[in-house]
Amino acid sequence: MDDVLISYCVVTGSFLGFQLLFSAISPRLFTKYSSTYRQLSFGKQCEWDSRFVSTNHALIVGSACLYILAYDDAVNADPIWGDPFWVKMNVAITCGYLVQDLLLLARFWKVMRDPYMVCHHLAVFYSYGYVLNRGVLPYFANFRLISELSTPFVNQRWFFDVIGKPRSSWPVLLNGLAMALVFFIVRIAVIPSYYSQVFATFGTEGYIRLGIGPQVAWIVSCVVLDILNVFWMYKIARGFYKVVKAKPDGKPRRNHAD
């Protein structure tokens, strides 16, 4: 079977799997085992289920990224045209998740409004379309997906807020520290290294073979994603600083965007 067809089968399966997780597994699981979940409004339950799906996606894709980075010699040897099969499968899983999440945001926009996440998803789609259809830039696509490793900590911070865990408590502080460190490492600290590798490909035969479409999609999506990452890093650092500086008995104002 053609790799492109396999990729789109994985996209479809990923979409259906994550939708099942959102609409059936998560509600039943947490209705049975979480009294907090049962007391939430419909909108908050939707966001809870969405973040549960997001965490599962991040763990699956992030783990696969690390494996590919460590053991896929073909991709590491030729970052533009190396054998992209496993990267394409991982990207397909992400694309299926993004479709599910975008449809979810559209359906529940009034209660889950997040324009920054929509911009993020569309930028990812723009670039990953070339990975799925042409199998180009596998190393750089995989490198980008490693950023998902920070997502579970971001979601856990939200879960702590919802269950009423004080932001000055040790579990919340430790998660906040881990979130800030991992987010910085996988999304911010890697920026110089990433772009140095990008610039190193300019003018090479492999880069020229890409053509203008993939070249523009690659650079534009990277710039958009990194602007968003820097913005989110600032908000995370600011929020963590506020919590650390707050009085132990203080109750900082909760803001989903913090």
UniProtKB/Swiss-Prot annotation:
Residues 43-245 form the TLC domain. It is a multi-pass membrane protein. Disulfide bonds: none annotated. InterPro entries: TLC-dom, TLCD. GO terms for cellular component: endoplasmic reticulum; membrane. It is found in: Membrane. Keywords: Membrane, Transmembrane, Transmembrane helix. GO terms for biological process: lipid homeostasis. The chain crosses the membrane at residues 5-25, 52-72, 85-105, 116-132, 171-191, 212-232. Belongs to the TLCD4 family. PANTHER family: CT120 PROTEIN (PTHR13439), TLC DOMAIN-CONTAINING PROTEIN 4-B (PTHR13439:SF49). This is TLC domain-containing protein 4-A. It comes from Xenopus laevis (African clawed frog).
